[in-house]
Structures are given as structure tokens and as C-alpha cells.
Amino acid sequence: MSIPKQLPCMVRALYAWPGEREGDLKFTEGDLIECLSIGDGKWWIGRHINTNTQGIFPSNFVHCLDIPTVRPGSSMSRTSASSFRYSSPQKSSIDTPITSSDQGLTPDLVGSSNALNKPTRESDSLKHQKSHPMLNSLGSSLSLKKSVSRPPSSMSRTNLDVSSRWDNTADNDSQIDAQDLSRSTPSPLRSAMENVLQSLNAMGKKSFSRANSPLLRLTKSTTTSKETDFIPVPPAHGSTSMTSRSKLDDSTDNSSKPRTSLQPGESPMKSSRDISRKPSMASSVLSPSDYFPQHRRFQSAPAPIPRPVSTLIPLTQVRTTASNVIKPRPQTTERPSTAQSFRKGGGFLKKTFKKLLRRGSSKRKPSLQPTPPVSYPAHNVPQKGVRPASPHTLKSVKDDLKRTKTYTKAEFAAKREEIFNKLSMPVYEPLKDLSECIGNVLADGEPVQFSVGTNIHNMNFSAIDKQIRSIIPQRVQVSPAVLAKNYLAPGQTTALAQMRAVFIYISERITFTNQTLDNDELRTSTQVISEGQGTPFEVALLVKEMLQALDLWCEVIEGYLKSPDDIYYTRDININHAWNVVTFDNEVRLIDASFASPTHPQQALKSSSSNDFYFLMKPNECIFTHVPENPDQQFIMPDLSMPIVMALPWVSSVYFTLGLKLRKFNTSILHLNDLEVLQIEFLAPKDIECVAEVDALSALAPTADVSQCYKYTLTQAFWETPDIRVMRVKAVMPANNRAAVLRIYAGRLGVSSPVRTAPHPMAMSLPFVHHGKNKALEFVTRHPVPHCPSVDLYINSPQCGTLHSGVEYKFNVSAYACQPSTSISNTRLAIQTPTGNIVRLREERSGNGVIFFSLSLTINETGEYRALILAEKIGRWVVYATWQAV
């Protein structure tokens, strides 16, 4: 993108832009736009030269031209715009005004051979003006076609023969015989239209000279640097014939590389358009005219690419096989040039003109024979030249693919045995041991199953919470008993309501602090209330005194509060926390008002209210983070040993409220050897999405670069059965590190953020270590797809984020139905190359709510490769994953 030196200025469209909303300026590739204002820098304001419409447009879709311009109100500007307004869309590549590049390459389409001996263009123009006056016969179709195309100018070719000139159009329809036309009865509507066109022709001729028009200056400035001295020899007079309309329309689906010489069997006009076409346009498989009606830019696309290709890709760009990207088509025809042509979509009135002009002519001229399509050699196919991959690169690719492969059950068992023998460390399965416990302990000492009991989390306490939060805090010397009886208990008729009132008041009004008094003594409960802050031990004692004042049994439990960064085999276990135990419905429950406070540093929920999960917790849920000093205070039968309790992963309240459940978890997977990858699996409901990251800051020096300390993981969902949805997380150890922490965030679907961020609260934290050699590895980047909520996509391969040029990769993707009643038969997947080519993935097999797609693709371009899924609701391609090719 270039910045205009002065305003207004002329810019040329590099790509097609259909606009996103009202007020946008629509244009096609190659159009001229007069920039009136640069706006905010990214969106400019301009006027379309062809349509004379104004609007805003993206600045990276155009490039500035160093030519002077005129104001929209001038006569030159209006006449210039009107001179192109009546060009036929079907013949835009033929009827396009001839630019300086066309003159420099092919000065004559049809003419005598002595045309090359003319000294200058000025003398050529004067001679042409004297020898070829305008044809003004209304009864002749030749003059009408001439007026529709453009008025005569100094750029016209010398020795122009009228019949041969109009024999070279792209239209397959026959020329209108003037004699047959004169014998027929003229139509009044046709006569009126001819008069209008003739008047417009005369007006355009008087208003300005095309030799000094902005268009001519524009084309001279843009093509002089490339096409200055090369002038090919024109063919013999009358030897040029253009293809039929059907061939011309078919040619818009193909492209070729620009050529610098005239090929045998080609017309000079076609050769000039080949040379004037830009390489960036030739690299696309489809012409912009194919996808112009549906092309839009998706603003929330997180992954930028070198050229402005939309995140929402039109359907018409799709190729169903990879051969279209790598190999040329055996028979292709050249599409119309977009760099030097000014085309406008055909309207109803223009089509009516053409039908009336062709009326009365049923003959076809024998000289107009369709030209067979031109075959291009393989080296002219627009693809980026890449050398074959070296053996070292192939070995590196093989290692990355093997490293990211999913472990099987047998491999997990072998890994467990290897860790046990190599490191001489016991392997624990804490989740399995916890599930084998009978259950919670009742108040009378009898066990009860975990699933039995009142579910506190589904109860509504909004009325009690609102009443307690309306109480103005008293910063006076008041005892806990007076506060509970006179301020909190009134209006609370049940023991559950009274416990809830005490919990809300203390957790939201008492700020967490680790600082004790100067003499390391605990504050009294009265001091905690008056100061509004307290340590976990002081808060637990305050809860006990207030509940006992309300005749409710409560005791204090001291123990160790696990940190998200604690490794399971740590021996640094000190008493650092305290919480309370109560009885409810003849069942033991736990309350931690200090940890539920929004001011606690380990609080996962970043909100101003307390965390309700830590009100009346079950012992089997509390044991993950709260390790009591006395094993009897676990209130689980049988009691778990200290190593097993420490081996339990750190989980927050989000883990339980969202219904997550770890599986196949043991401590051996937290030890990585050489090039191994950490793999974690857990069950998750269908409306839950997860994000993971690896934090290596705790293992590095304080002066380490923070931007280089985070390596991201790969999180994907798949369905084992129509009812079991599994989230699989893979992570690697950052290079030059021996220890790190895997943090998993979870939340409800619908967050339109890149997966490489943490839009949800942390649900799990798993510290892990690495032994042996290590190698840097990045996974493929996944993006959320809110437009396709009924499909879960799982990338089987390649899961590495870096693709190497010259290597053939096999893309395997599985699509799962999120609901048994949802049909995913219409799922369409594709891969988009850095140059914008789209290759469809083939459906291999399907069944039981899953479809497997595959594609073998050789990486011949460097840049960003995108994985696309067709969103049926909006009819666009949406990006769900990206790779980087190097």
C-alpha cells in the first residue's frame, strides 16, 4: 500500500471489492478510482471513474498512480467517465480502449505492413484523423458498434479497415449486413437509441481529446517501465480471428503466466494483454470475475496473509483436486486482461441494445471462425518455484509427524513401565484410587456414596445474597455473635439460609491478606470485622464463631492449599491454609470463605462476587486442592495416602461446574523423554470449548523474555460415541527448559477469539518435566468456528504447525456431529494456498456420525495455508486452522 502524495489522486484496483455495507465503493480488478480522501488511513474515500459513484474502500486493495487528476466536477472527468460507460461486458477485453502498452506492443491489429515505418505517434494520429472521419450513418450497424465501443481518438490505429476491424471482436454473432438491414423496416425504438448513442458520441468527441486524457496518462505511466522498446511484428491483414463468445467465457476460468513474446497462432492483441497482466493476478486459479459477486472480507479473521484474501472465501474459487494447483490444464484459453481493461457489469438496457442490433440478421460471416484454444506449456503455469526437499528436511518432517502422532493405550502402558524402571519412581493413578473410595462420611461416621445428597450448586440463593449485600459494613468494634444475630440472621429461617448469609458476608466483605500482626499473632475476630481483612486462619476462626453463635456446628481444619505450579512429588508441604467443616442434611460439607473471596490470588473466576462453589463443598471435590494435615479430616473412606493426594491434578471450580472429567491420567505422562509430547484427555459436554497453553516462566530466570516463554498447545474435540465427547490436549516442552506447567482453560461455546488466547477461566493445571534431548515444535493453530456449531473438526494430520516446501503432506480431517439428530452429510472441507487457490478435500468414508476427509498436497508455495469449512448459513468458507509453509 502506497500513500498518495497529493489529493485528489488516481489509484488502480489490484483486486475486486464488492463492498460490505451501504456506502462502500464497489469495483472490479483493474478499475480506476479517483481518491478524494484517505480517511483513517485504512479506508479511503473515492469516486469510481466508470460508474461515477462515491464511497469508501480498503486502501490495501489499490495502489496509487503518480499522475495528475481533475476534480469530479470538471468536464474532462465527466466525459472520461461517460466514454467507458457503454462498453459491453461480453466484449470488455476487445472493446477496451487501447492504452500505451497496447500501442507499444502491437501498434496495428489490422493494417498495412508499412505502419512500422511511421516516425512518431503524433504524426500517426494526425494521419489517422485525416484519413478516417467518423461514420455517421444511422442505418449502418458499423457506425453503431463504433459509437457503442468508444469515440474515435488519436490512439486509433492507422489504415483502419472498417470491415476487418469489426471482424476481430470476441462476439460469435455474425456481422449485420447493411443491405439486408436497409431493406427491413427500421424500428422506432432502435432509431431513438441510435440517435442517443450518436449524440453521446458527438459530445464525447468535442469535450476532450483522448491523447491528453487521464486514462492515457495513466496507462503510459503504468506500462512504460515494462514495455518500452519491444514492438512485435503485426500479422498479415485479415489473418486475425477471435474466438467465439462461448470460448471467451470459458477462458475466464483459466490463467497463464505473462509472456514476453508473441506465440504462434496468437493475435497481437492477445499477446499485449498477456504482457500487461500482473503476476499476482496470474497466480490465481480463477479470475476475479468469477468470485466478484460473492467476495467479502471477514473482519474478525485472526490470521493475516500476505495478500488480501478473505477469511470467508467464495464458493466459486474451489478446485476439487490437488492437480489443479500443481499441474497445468491440458487445454486452456486466455482470460481477458484485468490490468488494462475497464469493465462494467452488463445491465438490462445494454442487453436490450444488443438484441435490437442483432435483430434482422440471421446470417453468419464465413470469415468469423472460432479459433481453437491455445495450449500452454507446463512452465507457464502460475506456481511458485520450489526446489525439492533435502534429505535433512525430509527427516525433520518425518520426526515432526511421528512426534505429533496420538499415543495408543499400549504406548501409554509402555511409557508407564519405562518411567518406573528408568527413573525408579512409582507411578500413581490418583483418579482411579479416588473413584474406588466408598464415599463421603456422614455425621455419625457412616459412609455414603458421592452421588447421594443435596446438590447445592443447583439451588437459587439470589434473594439471600441480595439481602446480605445490601447491609452496610460496620467498621466498629462489634463481636461476631452480635453481627450474626442482629444483622445476618434476621429473615433467615433455615440453617442453610443462615450459613449462606455468613458465607456471603465474610467472603465479600473480608479482604484476603497474608500479613499477620507485627508480633505474628492472629487478629481477633472483632479486629478482622473492623479492619475488613484477614488471613485464611483468621477468616476460618471468624466463620466458626459466627455459626456457633447461630447454634450451628462448625470446626476449623488446617492443612495445605495446593498451588497450580506444584509438582506432584514435591516435599515442600507446609501448613498454609485453613477452612471449615459443617454438617448439612446429615452429611459432612466443607466451607472455604477465604478461598472463595474475589481478592484471593488463586481465584479462577475473575469477578467481584464470591465463588459459590466453595460453599458446602463435598469432600471428594475439596480433596483436589485442600490437603488436610490430619488424614482423618479428609472425610473419605478409606483415607487416601499423602502421595496419592498430592498426585491429584490441580483443578478449580470450573472443572466441576462445567462437568469436565479427566481420564487415562497417571503420573507417568507428566514425564517426557526426548521428543515425546504430553497428551491429556478429558470428557467435556458438547457446549464446552477448551484452550490450553504451556507456561515456562516458573522454570526460567526472572530476566527471561516473556514473549519467548510461552509455547502453545493443540486442543481438539472428538466423539467416541454419540454420547461421549472427548477433548484431547497435546503439549510440548519449550526448548531449553526442563519444567513447565500446562494450563487448561474451559468455558461455554460462542467466544469469537483465537484459540491462542485464554478467553475462559482456568480449569486445570498440570506441571510436567522433560528428560533428554528436545527440539522446538509448534502445533497447527486452531480457530473457533461459531458459524458451524453442529460440527466438531479434528485434524488427524499434519498436526505440526510448520510445513516444509517440496514435501508432500497428507491432510486427514475428521468431522463429528455434535448431536445424534444433526446431519453432517453436507460438510465441505478445503485447503487454501498462500496465493488463494482452494483445493477440496475428498470424502473417504462416513458412518456413525463421523466423516473422514483426506487430501495429498505437495507444498509448492511459502506462506500461510488455511483449512476451510463451508458454513451453510452464510454460504462462505470459514478458516478453522492455519499452517505456515517455509
Curated annotation (Swiss-Prot):
UniProt-annotated location(s): Cell tip
SMART domains per the UniProt record, alphabetical: SH3, TGc
CDD domains noted in UniProt: SH3_Cyk3p-like
GO-annotated cellular components: cell cortex; cell cortex of cell tip; cell cortex of non-growing cell tip; cell division site; cell tip; cytoplasm; division septum; mitotic actomyosin contractile ring
Chain intervals with Polar residues compositional bias: 89-104, 155-188, 253-264
Keywords: Cell cycle, Cell division, Phosphoprotein, SH3 domain
Protein name: cytokinesis protein 3
Stretches for region Disordered: 72-189, 219-290, 358-393
Function per UniProt: Involved in cytokinesis.
UniProt-listed InterPro entries: CAP/Cytokinesis_protein, Cyk3_SH3, Ig_CYK3_C, Papain-like_cys_pep_sf, SH3-like_dom_sf, SH3_domain, Transglutaminase-like
Keyword match Cell cycle: yes
Residues modified as Phosphoserine: S213
TM region(s), chain numbering: none
Every SH3 domain range: 6-67
Comp. bias intervals (Low complexity): 72-88, 135-154
